[in-house]
Structure formats: structure tokens, C-alpha cells
Amino acid sequence: MKSVGLRLRPAEGAFPGVDEALAGIPGVTREGIQHLEWLADGTYAMLYRVSGGDEVAIGEVLTAHDEVLQHDMVSAGADQYYVFVNVAEQESVSALLQILDEHRLLLDPPLRVTDDGLCVTVAGDGDALQAAFADVTDVEVPIEVEWTGGYRPGEPAALSRLTDRQREALEAAHSLGFYETPREASFEDIGEALSCSPSTANELLRRAEARVVSSLLDG
């Protein structure tokens, strides 16, 4: 089973409708979408995680929005909220979800909102992922492939970005004590564990570390 990380770049940095409305509330930052369900009537049930802003102001914006059919909020700590919304269908969003359905692919939450767009992880059969990406070229929303890798349910997203060989290198380095202080293993030790040269072990580990750090800092 494979997974791919995609970055969606909607116009103006938000999808039309409730996403755009939340983005426009002063002080509010959309951190991510924890759950997204495409319901039988065509509407969406979504659970946003947001930070900042005022709970009353957020509620007023959602109540006044024509496309919001239902909404609710729950506090997640200081200036943190989970926002549930049931919203009317958007053609651009449904077009993307339809592609996932047609190719029997999984949308692996959460969907992470960053300054550069919406980061999404999709998982499924490798051939189906390739076929689906060919279809998304016809969708209005610009989409970029950020990374590809294996898929293990419940695994941190940062590890999903690694190739099998990079994962092996990182696991070997960790188990051998490469990250201990003082360091208990060398590239020679890692190379021996992987049946490769020290220089190859170094390269695999460097690339794995770069992908993990990029995932943690860039979303």
C-alpha cells in the first residue's frame, strides 16, 4: 500500500465558501481539517481545528453564511477550537472527492492548512494513485505532489514520506544508537546493517532526516 502527499493551492489561499469565510475572520488561523465526510445529499460534514479569534465572532460568521447548514464549536484549550460545519456542496471539492471514490483511495486526515495551501495525504494501491493523479490534472484547483512513500495506518505523517530504504536506514540508526549522546554507532555500522557502503548509508540517512524535518516544519 502506498501513499502520496499533495499540496492543493486554491485561489486566494482558501476554497470558496466556509473555508474562505473562516480564513477571513480577524485573528483566526485554520490549523487543519480533522475530518471530512461527503454525505449522501451532496453536502459535507467537516471538523476544523482553528486557533485565535473570538468564539462569538466565529459563530456569528458561520450563522450568517448562506452555505452553512449547521455548525457547532467546542473549546480545545486556550484560543483553540474545534469547529463542526455541515455545508453545501462545492463543485471543485466534489470533483476531487469523486476522483478518490472512482479509484478507491483513502483520504488520510488530518488535512493540514499552511500558508502555501492545503496538505493532504492520500493512500491506496500504487497503480490507482498514478491513475488518480492523471485525472486531477483536469481539476480547477492546482495540485502538486510533495512526496511519495509507503503507508502504515496510524503512523506519523513524517515517516510516510520516506522510501522503504530511507526508513530502514533511519530505523537502523536509531536502534544502533546513532542518535545517542555520545554517539554509539557510525555510518560503517549502519552500512553493515543495511548491507551497503558507509557512503550509501550516509546518503540514505541524510535524505531521510531531510524529509522528516521538512514534514515537521513545513507541514
Predicted regions and their residues:
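Short, Lys/Arg-enriched C-terminal cap helix and immediately downstream tail that follows
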Residues: R207-G219
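Residues within the DNA-recognition helix of helix-turn-helix
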Residues: S197, L204, A208
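Short helix-to-turn junction characteristic of helix-turn-helix DNA-binding domains
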Residues: A173-E180
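Linker/hinge segments immediately adjacent to helix-turn-helix/homeobox DNA-binding domains
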Residues: E91-R165
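Short alpha-helical "packing" element that flanks the helix-turn-helix/winged-helix DNA-binding module
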Residues: Q166-A173
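DNA-contacting interfaces and partner/effector-binding or oligomerization modules
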Residues: M1-G124
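Alpha-helical oligomerization segments
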Residues: S195-C196, V213
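Short alpha-helical "recognition helix" segments of helix-turn-helix
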Residues: E184, I190-L194, A201
